[in-house]
From Swiss-Prot:
GO terms for cellular component: plasma membrane. Pfam families: Rnf-Nqr. Belongs to the NqrDE/RnfAE family. Its EC number is 7.-.-.-. InterPro entries: Ion_transpt_RnfA/RsxA, NqrDE/RnfAE, NqrDE/RnfAE_oxidrdctase. GO terms for biological process: electron transport chain. The chain crosses the membrane at residues 5-25, 39-59, 63-83, 102-122, 134-154, 171-191. Its main location: membrane. This is Ion-translocating oxidoreductase complex subunit A. It is a multi-pass membrane protein. Part of a membrane-bound complex that couples electron transfer with translocation of ions across the membrane.
Amino acid sequence: MTEYLLLLVSTVLINNFVLVKFLGLCPFMGVSGKLETAVGMGLATTFVMTLASASSYLMEHYILIPLNIAYLRTLAFILVIAVVVQFTEMVIRKSSPTLYRLLGIFLPLITTNCAVLGVALLSINERHNFIQSIIYGFGAAAGFSLVLILFAAMRERLVAADVPTPFRGVSIAMVTAGLMSLAFMGFTGLIKI
């Protein structure tokens, strides 16, 4: 049980996909303009990454390895992720049309989010079992969502702040992201492995 908790905490805080592995930067910068959109994108991505991680494990161990076609791993994982994203899109369209409109083009783009493919590939490369794969996927997604929501809240505050003209827009967003990354570096000594 402790092993699973350590995996979750280290994936969320210490090895954060956005701030440490630099995966998922496109939605991180693109959807973080409004807090409401960031929360919706975080929830959708959490669902997709967790389900994609579990599905990729099953695809790897029950189809690719037994058929000796592991060289098709990336293509197979992209197809699995596309199916999961389409399912998520249908659920969001039915349950929350407002959120569906707010997310706009970013919802189908979850398919090409490198963090989603990255969690599937890294989980296989780190030789996680099925439970660890689900926890790793959820932890990576929770870390992504945490950083996305915090960054969106800061960007909303920056709109009202008196930022010098040369730093407005993307410039101050990049500086803020860098400061967030430095803050998360403080968690590095939290877990000794």
